[in-house]
Design a protein with these regions (language model features):
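Acidic, proline/glycine-enriched N-terminal capping motif
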Residues: 1-197
Length: 197
């Protein structure tokens, strides 16, 4: 028999102590995400810069090497704004992130004729080439800051999953989409910065 340590007041407001505690995952994060969004579009890296001469001033400027980073960030911002509930306040606490990027498999990986939908056996199973996974994460994290999902991407303190796969893995690998894009989840980090905890 459980004996209460104090008597609850009859205020009509449920006690916060009566709530079921949130379950935590294996790495100290809450099992239900704070924020979740599915973004469609071609993921693009951010971070590689090229020197270009300004036609008007003649000065050298550093510009993003990938022209696709702007449209990708716009896709992330638009999807994140749609996914945010009304009255959303940007996250201000440390978060753990999961990002599963889906890339379109190049046409050269497929057969021809009646085998046009079949991946050639000689094609790579994984996208172990450009774009770099870390640069995909960088562009996506910055876009989430722009969408005010969190105050700053410096709040990302760990990754639960950071994955890139081809769209042909849809249904075989969790969160791989049927078309190019990304599944993003953010969790609060429980016990962050508690010494000895």
């Amino acid at each position: 028999m459980d004996v209460p340590l104090w008597e609850a007041e009859e205020t009509g407001v449920p006690s916060v102590f009566a709530e079921k505690p949130r379950e935590t995952g294996p790495v100290g994060t809450v099992s239900a995400p704070l924020f979740e969004v599915k973004v469609y579009g071609a993921p693009a890296p951010q971070g590689s810069k090229s020197a270009k001469r300004n036609r008007h001033t003649g000065r050298i400027q550093l510009v993003e090497s990938s022209r696709a980073v702007g449209p990708w960030r716009e896709h992330v911002v638009a999807a994140a704004l749609r996914a945010r509930p009304r009255g959303w306040k940007p996250i201000t606490e440390p978060v753990a992130v999961e990002m599963v990027f889906t890339l379109t498999r190049p046409r050269s990986h497929f057969g021809t004729g009646r085998n046009a939908a079949v991946v050639r056996p000689s094609s790579p199973a994984l996208p172990a080439s450009v774009p770099d996974l870390s640069k995909l994460a960088r562009s996506t994290e910055d876009a989430l800051t722009t969408a005010a999902v969190y105050r700053d991407d410096a709040l990302v303190v760990e990754y639960r999953r950071l994955v890139k796969r081809y769209h042909t893995d849809h249904g075989l690998v969790p969160d791989v989409m049927e078309a190019s894009g990304c599944v993003i989840r953010l969790w609060p980090v429980v016990g962050a910065g508690v010494p000895g905890g």
